[in-house]
């Protein structure tokens, strides 16, 4: 599933927070979660919902390759490498510390570990877990971190916010940490 199923708020999101997607993507994820609950009820099919926050990173040795890249971190790194002239910042008037969206970036290897634990811990009663680090980074913070690491200036331009982009999506991973002993091992 996805963090996109939640109603936006300016603090960490828990599994019991209000479900109210702000975009089509989140709505489809929530509908699928509801379908799984019906399948469990009618057919006894057990499942675990893992609500991802922003997946990032690459598997070591495999890398990452998206055609028509849309993910912030690879775009920022492309700009640092001179493959892009600048980064578009979609919205600079959000109610956040620097006006840009804040996201919780969770490494794909940490997501893989959560999936393995889900297979080991599936029960008759469906469970839902947030899979994130509990730390949020704004778009400008990601750009600044990339500049610090690469030593390159990354140019950015503010453009209009995209419809349905939440201001703040950061996980409260307490439930998965306590119940399964899972914790993100990678940071930004």
Task: Show the residue positions of the predicted features.
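Active-site proximal helix/loop that lines the substrate pocket
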Residues: 2-5, 57-60, 94, 120, ...
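Catalytic helix-loop patch of NAD(P)-dependent Rossmann-fold dehydrogenases
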Residues: 4-54, 61-71
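Short, small-residue-rich loop/turn micro-motifs
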Residues: 2-4, 51-54, 91-93, 173
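C-terminal catalytic core of Y-nucleophile DNA break-rejoin enzymes
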Residues: 70-73, 107
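Structural signature of the Rossmann-like NAD(P)-dependent dehydrogenase/reductase core
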Residues: 1, 48-54, 104, 130-132
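Short acidic, glycine/proline-rich loop/turn micro-motifs
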Residues: 60-62, 100-101
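C-terminal substrate-binding subdomain of Rossmann-fold SDR/epimerase-dehydratase oxidoreductases
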Residues: 78-188
């Amino acid at each position: 599933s996805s963090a996109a199923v939640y109603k936006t708020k300016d603090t960490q999101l828990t599994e019991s927070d209000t479900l109210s997607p702000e975009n089509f993507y989140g709505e489809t994820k929530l509908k699928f979660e509801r379908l799984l609950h019906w399948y469990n009820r009618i057919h006894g099919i057990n499942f675990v919902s893992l609500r991802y926050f922003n997946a990032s990173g690459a598997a070591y040795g495999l890398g990452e390759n998206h055609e028509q890249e849309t993910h912030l971190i690879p775009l920022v790194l492309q700009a640092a490498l001179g493959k892009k002239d600048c980064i578009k910042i979609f919205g600079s008037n959000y109610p956040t510390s620097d006006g840009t969206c804040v996201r919780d970036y969770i490494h794909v290897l940490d997501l893989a570990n959560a999936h393995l634990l889900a297979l080991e811990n599936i029960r008759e009663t469906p469970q839902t877990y947030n899979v994130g680090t509990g730390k949020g980074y704004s778009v400008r913070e990601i750009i600044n971190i990339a500049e610090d690491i690469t030593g390159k200036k990354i140019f950015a331009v503010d453009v209009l916010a995209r419809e349905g982009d939440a201001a703040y999506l950061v996980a409260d991973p307490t439930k998965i940490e306590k119940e399964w002993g899972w914790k993100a091992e990678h940071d930004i």
